[in-house]
Amino acid sequence: MNTYAIIDTGGEQLRVEPGRFYDMRHFTLLNPSILDSNTKVLIYRVLMIHHESNIALGDSWLEDATIKGRVLHSHFKDKITIYKMRSKKKMRRKLGYRLNLARFVVDSICFDGKEFYK
């Protein structure tokens, strides 16, 4: 059984399957300390669901579709370094930052009152 969904979160679109884990940036605009381990999450911004040979597409989002999951932990990604230089002007600038990511696992995909597990 090949079930997956495409969700919109954190400014990007992800293809998610039940039983797999994913790293998401900008998971919530709330305080990151709220995202403790095993915090349950419901995602309503589901763009498409594929189950066996059926495909359900939404006009922007699907109405009766949710993704149930839980947050495993939050962590930082490797540091991204930005180096700007203008030749012959003696201008050099070095900046860097680390993205705050939340790793979560998809428990099930719900659509029209049915739940699809792994």
Swiss-Prot record:
Cross-referenced Pfam families: Ribosomal_L21p
Compartments in which it is found: Plastid, Chloroplast
Gene Ontology molecular function: rRNA binding; structural constituent of ribosome
Keywords associated with the record: Chloroplast, Plastid, Ribonucleoprotein, Ribosomal protein, RNA-binding, rRNA-binding
GO cellular component: chloroplast; ribonucleoprotein complex; ribosome
SUPFAM superfamilies on file: L21p-like
Role: This protein binds to 23S rRNA.
Family: Belongs to the bacterial ribosomal protein bL21 family.
Protein name, per record: Large ribosomal subunit protein bL21c
